[in-house]
Amino acid sequence: MWRRIEAHPKAWDMIVVGGGATGVGVAIDAAARGYAVLLLEQSDFGKGTSSRSTKLAHGGLRYLEQGNIGLVMEALKERGLLLENAPHIVHDLAFVLPNYDWWEAPFYGLGLKLYQLLAGKYGFGTSRILSREETLAHLPTLKTEGLRGGAVYYDGQFDDARLLIHMVATAFEQGATLLNYVEVTGLTKDAHGFVDGVTARDVETGNEFRAVAKVVVNATGAFSDLLRLKAEPSAAPMIVPSQGIHLVFEASFLQGESAIMVPHTRDGRVLFAIPWHGHTLVGTTDTPIGAATLEPVAMEQEIEFILATAGQYLTKAPTRDDVLSVFAGVRPLVRATGVTSGAVSTAALSRDHVIHIDRSGLVTVCGGKWTTYRHMAEDCVDQAATLAQLPEKPCVTHHLHIHGFHDEAKEEAAKEFGALAVHGSDAYEIRKLIETDAGLGEPLHAALPYVKAEVIWAARHEMARTVEDTLARRTRALFLNARAALAMAPAVADLMASELGWDEATRTKQLAAFRDVAANYVLHP
């Protein structure tokens, strides 16, 4: 891992601030065109919104209902490209809409056919109406009282943090330089008042430095306005943050390989119950919040809402005692042009991406969704390169394979590598670690599939710098079972200490920091 940016006092074509899906996507796109790219992330890659999604690569049925055909078509195309470029992480999944009223089958069936039609050659499967028996075959734990049947359609599912880490590796392979735990403390300007670089601080060492670039891209998501204010103190806010939470349960709450999709909840959102890494993931909510934080906390009313709504559809109504983990994320929704203050309905805010260029030349890319990160990046790099008068070069990411790509089908990879299959082609190298030292094949916890070799791999090759990085984003232990993650933490700290050279004081500090974060993922009775 390369931590010393000071040793490379070069002028960059582009500096990207923010290491989530959007920022890393921009770094991949720009580097693949041949531009010199530096990306700086104040915390870990995906620490914010990008690791806290509903884990869906989808077009968005709700946007279709709202009449946003353009967004749906764009997302369906990008969904198809995601599956093509990262089949080791993205896969198709059957979603069932249970029908309890006579009108639901024809109504939703028609909408799903349109959704399928809009996907064109990027379609994932054929939607159809299901009988009552077929619906229960898909969803054995669905409540049967009043059930008439259902409708099934196919969308994409993925592991968001795992995909992001492989995108980071892809950006490196294309020639970009990316650093986590480097905070941008300010923007620098030339004699004409145009942004020409950043000042930054290495969080680990405290070292400060300046980096110069022809253009700076603000890809800080929910925190976009904070960086914009450094460029233009009078800048009007663009972002209206909204919080969504998810609850995680044992797989027994949703037996089988299909997901439930509830098209209308009482807060106007869609609710999903999804099989994910051997567990059941249920969410989400849409709660306006005053300001974004790196570690948002689920509100009681959100927790109760999901428990109550899930209980309306599942034969065994989940309770607080059943929750293995609860996590919250912040959506960086974009305020409508000309609206600068006042209460705004989150349902009315834009889910489209926006690229804004301040008078000082700071390029801000925000909004959008995980599925469309590649298209957002293409659009952003096009505009940033034009602004900076960089040599015109076409986007090449449409068919650029993400790191870890291999041709094996999901089922074949799972047979060969088991839980290591999520690492794609890296699974071969992780298996070599185990072959060299059998002890590295030992599981870290009986309730989760992770082994010691994955910790070593994360520290050596995936820029994991903290216990939290490993347990939250290199593995998904914290998101799947918070108590199990807490139990694993000492062993993870020991392994990372040996790899990263921590002394006992650092190890102790790391464990304390992780326990503080993990406390918000544990739901108490």
Residue spans for each PLM region:
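Extreme N-terminal leader/targeting segments of oxidoreductases
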Residues: 1-14, 29-33
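Glycine-rich Rossmann-fold phosphate-binding loop(s) that bind the pyrophosphate
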Residues: 18-20, 42
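A conserved short coil-to-beta-strand element within the FAD-binding core of flavoproteins
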Residues: 180-196
